């Protein structure tokens, strides 16, 4: 009886919440009819090209399509490491779109970066381009009033939310708990894909969401992240993947969301779309100017592009699951594991969360047992640079396994690393424009509460406090280079969540030059000035060391966190020119 009483209230609350989970067909039809009748149909353009701007990026993609054959595809690929080019490329492509724009993302906040992209998409819709936005509900648009305004803004703009909790745009704390208790498997399955696709010809895929910290605009903590821009036949794979997600039952239109539907039905007149209110309008104006500056685009994006052959876009299927009869849903995950398992000489891995799934552990253990195992270099987060403490704790627990059984060379990012990338230098050192590469001299550099499960989710997630001040950076890039032959840039964290629950996507480029570019980018983050190296402690008393390691191994085998305080390995500042200690 006491047990029943303990769970009676939570169960009652869940039942009350579930009673109003779905709308009636009549409510949905009525909201659809109201939006169709009263949506803003004004147009800012009457030209057949919908007033698209000229774009060297879209032009290069069109040329790649023209040069391609089924047997010999041609692609143009650009590695987007630095944040200003990554944001300017998006704006340029949105403004250059003539027919369609499809956006898929995990997080969309209403800070400067989020407002900027949303306003650009609204403008594109109003000049006649079909715009579709698909965002994961738990981490995006936590404002039913905003979504109500978007529903009326233009017939050319459609928004859907993936896997909304109890068919609502906003998840309250009690609903979050109820979602875990009543339907954990579905609640836990999130859409982690990131994609911007323009005219089914060129797309950007990778790790960046629409939030300030992904573009070096947060005042205190920003991410080192990465995308790849791909023009050519692989864009058709992107389009096919987006259609699967867009038409899946878990992707709900705005009129199907209870809190948005209620606002639509009670509107006396369609709400207007307000001008964005930027916290720092100067930097927004700057990147908007860069997005249409031919010299800037040439220096930062066109000159950095590579013309390559085979490129593939992979994505897991919607409603991904680890059930045996649904294995096809894990298509991208399977392909990544196969890539790594075929390595001959070197695997270079960058991930913010070094928490290996059982399948990944098996692959790396098998590689390390070879007579001549490949070298495995890992770039990941440190405790000082992460904002996902639970994930780091799990990584910390398995250091001995990673070093001894898998042969990893682990480098953990420092929070103030001065040269992990161009953005790092500009943000931390206040580098003036005269210090930029000569090809871009004079170019101006960039000087809400979220409920979640594990990992990075929102702008209120902050890293551990440090005694040192200044701008801090964390790692969010997810990439692999295998044998300098092919490379992957995507959203997959190589952890159990990415393996079994989140849908993931990314591009795989089969080109030596691109693999070399990506390899150099990752290795820059592992340099002594940018990262600590993880290596075994030096034994002081052999017998005590053996006892300590035995206890440590037992503690590591315990569920969840490892409580033994005397660790097998620790962090070192590696002296330049020296090799780290080996297990």
Predicted regions and their residues:
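Charged, low-complexity intrinsically disordered terminal segments
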Residues: 21-194, 198-583
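Bacterial N-terminal signal peptides
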Residues: 8-19
């Amino acid at each position: 009886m006491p047990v029943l009483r303990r769970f009676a209230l939570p169960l009652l609350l869940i039942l009350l919440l579930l009673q109003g989970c779905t709308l009636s067909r009549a409510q949905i039809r009525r909201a659809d009819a109201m939006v169709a009748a009263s949506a803003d149909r004004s147009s800012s353009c009457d030209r057949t090209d919908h007033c698209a701007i000229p774009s060297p990026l879209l032009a290069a993609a069109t040329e790649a399509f023209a040069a391609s054959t089924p047997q010999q595809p041609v692609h143009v690929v650009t590695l987007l490491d630095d944040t200003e080019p990554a944001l300017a490329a998006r704006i340029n492509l949105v403004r250059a779109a003539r027919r369609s724009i499809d956006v898929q993302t995990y997080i969309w906040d209403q800070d400067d970066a989020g407002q900027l992209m949303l306003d650009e998409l609204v403008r594109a819709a109003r000049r006649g381009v079909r715009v579709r936005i698909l965002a994961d509900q738990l981490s995006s648009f936590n404002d039913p009033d905003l979504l109500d305004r978007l529903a009326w803004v233009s017939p050319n703009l459609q928004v859907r939310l993936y896997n909304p909790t109890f068919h609502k745009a906003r998840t309250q704390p009690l609903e979050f708990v109820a979602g875990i208790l009543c339907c954990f498997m579905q609640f836990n399955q999130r859409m982690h894909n990131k994609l911007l696709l323009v005219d089914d010809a060129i797309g950007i895929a990778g790790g960046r969401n629409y939030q300030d910290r992904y573009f070096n605009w947060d005042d205190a903590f920003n991410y080192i992240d990465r995308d790849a821009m791909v023009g050519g036949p692989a864009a058709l794979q992107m389009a096919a993947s987006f259609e699967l997600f867009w038409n899946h039952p878990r992707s709900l239109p705005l009129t199907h969301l209870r809190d948005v539907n209620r606002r639509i039905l009670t509107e006396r007149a369609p709400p207007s779309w307000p001008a964005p209110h930027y916290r720092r309008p100067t930097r927004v104006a700057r990147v908007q100017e860069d997005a249409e500056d031919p010299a800037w685009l040439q220096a930062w994006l066109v000159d950095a592009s590579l013309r390559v052959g085979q490129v593939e876009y992979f994505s897991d299927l919607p409603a991904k699951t680890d059930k045996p009869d649904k294995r096809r849903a894990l298509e991208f995950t399977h392909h990544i594991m196969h890539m790594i398992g075929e390595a001959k000489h070197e695997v270079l891995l960058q991930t913010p969360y070094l928490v290996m799934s059982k399948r990944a552990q098996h692959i790396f253990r098998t590689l390390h047992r070879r007579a001549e195992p490949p070298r495995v270099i890992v770039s990941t987060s440190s405790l000082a640079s992460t904002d996902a403490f639970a994930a780091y704790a799990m990584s910390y627990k398995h250091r001995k396994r990673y070093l001894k059984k898998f042969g990893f060379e682990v480098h953990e990012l420092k929070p103030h690393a001065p040269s992990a990338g161009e953005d790092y230098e500009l943000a931390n050192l206040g580098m003036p424009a005269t210090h930029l590469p000569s090809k871009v001299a004079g170019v101006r550099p960039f000087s809400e509460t979220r409920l979640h499960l594990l990992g990075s989710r929102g702008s209120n997630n902050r890293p551990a406090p440090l005694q040192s001040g200044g701008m801090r950076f964390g790692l969010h890039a997810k990439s692999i280079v295998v044998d300098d032959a092919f490379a992957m840039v995507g959203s997959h964290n190589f952890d159990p969540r990415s393996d079994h629950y989140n849908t993931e996507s990314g591009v795989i480029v089969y080109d030596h030059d691109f693999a070399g570019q990506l390899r150099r980018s990752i290795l820059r983050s592992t340099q002594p000035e940018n990262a600590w190296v993880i290596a075994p402690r030096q034994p002081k008393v052999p017998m005590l060391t053996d006892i300590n390691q035995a206890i440590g191994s037992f503690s590591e085998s315990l569920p969840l966190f490892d409580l033994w305080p005397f660790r097998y390995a620790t962090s070192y500042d590696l002296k330049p020119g020296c090799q780290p200690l080996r297990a």
